[in-house]
Curated annotation (Swiss-Prot):
NCBIfam families: PRK00142.1-3. One of its GO terms (biological process) is tRNA modification. Pfam families: Rhodanese, Rhodanese_C, UPF0176_N. This is tRNA uridine(34) hydroxylase. Residues 123-217 form the Rhodanese domain. It comes from Staphylococcus aureus (strain bovine RF122 / ET3-1). Keywords: Oxidoreductase, tRNA processing. The active site is at residue 177.
Length: 318
């Protein structure tokens, strides 16, 4: 594999995010990189892909900047680009929690746990493990015994915690996310809310999966990633599939977006059921006039109507 995917972040001060984004985009394009980078006055949050040579040059360039000299990059090998375009965008926050009173992780954040320390927390019955990711990320893969917040956006997590506070009161709470950036701010918010014993997996699931001692132990399923790969393996000790097909409930790790462009819901579905149900999550979406699956596969009107009847069988067996 001659390509690499980089995942990184750093909370620090960028005085002029708009100018930084403009200059950084030019640099990335000049080095043929592709990906998504968010910058704000609170720091940088990025994931990008390129050849090994190009990504090594990028990391060297960042480490040569005093502001980023100690920034940690999580590196995955890849067979090609994981993104189609290159975006660098200025934002209010590098991870959107939308709090009335913002949290600065440089001053307030949970205790950092190494992969080995986190594994011990997973083995401790008195510790509550909270997955700080979205529900569709959890459903593809998660740590054994972790609590699944019923959210589709990170900014909804604080409200969910408030509604379910009884689950965590007076307990040791450990949280985790993909690369660590969400937990930096989320664990800080928990401390501000009065929770006292708060810790986080330092470097996230991505770091845990590459640790030579833990080897991803106690992770079930695959880790969702926000690029063209969709998911990556984490557990090197044992392989489990926990995802379930949207239609028949069989083991599945294949995510697609609903073919209705006005829906776009992410569902786990086999290739067989994607074809059977026209790439849609429901009858309403399957019959939508702009169904992308129908268009991409040049399905005739007669065949379209025929496949719509598959939803009748689905309801009969529900």
């Amino acid at each position: 594999m001659n390509y690499q995917v980089l995942l990184y972040y750093k909370y620090m001060t960028i005085d002029d995010p708009e100018q930084f984004a403009q200059d950084h985009l030019a640099f990335c394009k000049a080095h043929h990189l592709k990906g998504r980078i968010l910058v704000s006055t609170e720091g940088i949050n990025g994931t990008l892909s390129g050849t090994k040579e190009e990504t090594e040059q990028y990391m060297a360039h960042m480490h040569a900047d005093e502001r980023f000299k100690d920034m940690v990059f999580k590196i995955d090998e890849a067979e090609g680009h994981a993104f189609k375009k290159m975006h660098v965008r200025p934002r209010k926050e590098i991870v959107a929690l939308d709090l009335e009173e913002d949290v600065d992780p440089r001053h307030t954040t949970g205790q950092y746990l190494s992969p080995v320390e986190f594994r011990k927390a997973l083995e401790d019955d008195d510790t509550v493990i909270i997955d700080a990711r979205n529900d569709y990320e959890f459903d593809l893969g998660h740590f054994r015994g972790a609590i699944r917040p019923n959210i589709t956006r990170f900014r909804d997590l604080p409200d969910w915690i408030k509604e379910n506070k009884a689950l965590f009161a007076d307990k040791k709470v450990v949280t985790y996310c993909t690369g660590g950036i969400r937990c930096e701010k989320f664990s800080g918010w928990l401390l501000k809310e009065g929770f006292e014993d708060i810790a986080q997996l330092h470097g996230g699931i991505a770091t845990y999966g590459k640790d030579p001692e833990t080897k991803g132990q106690y992770w079930d399923g695959k880790m969702y990633v926000f690029d063209d790969r969709i998911s990556v393996d984490i557990n090197e000790v044992e392989k489990t599939i926990i995802g379930k097909d949207w239609f028949d409930g069989k083991p599945c790790e294949r995510y697609i977006n609903c073919a209705n462009p006005e829906c776009n819901k992410q569902i786990l579905v086999s290739e067989e059921n994607e074809a059977k149900y026209l790439g849609a999550c429901s009858y309403e979406c399957a019959k939508h006039e702009r169904n992308r699956y129908v268009q991409a596969n040049n399905i005739s009107d007669n065949e379209w109507q025929h496949r719509l009847t598959n939803f009748d069988d689905l309801h009969q067996h529900a």
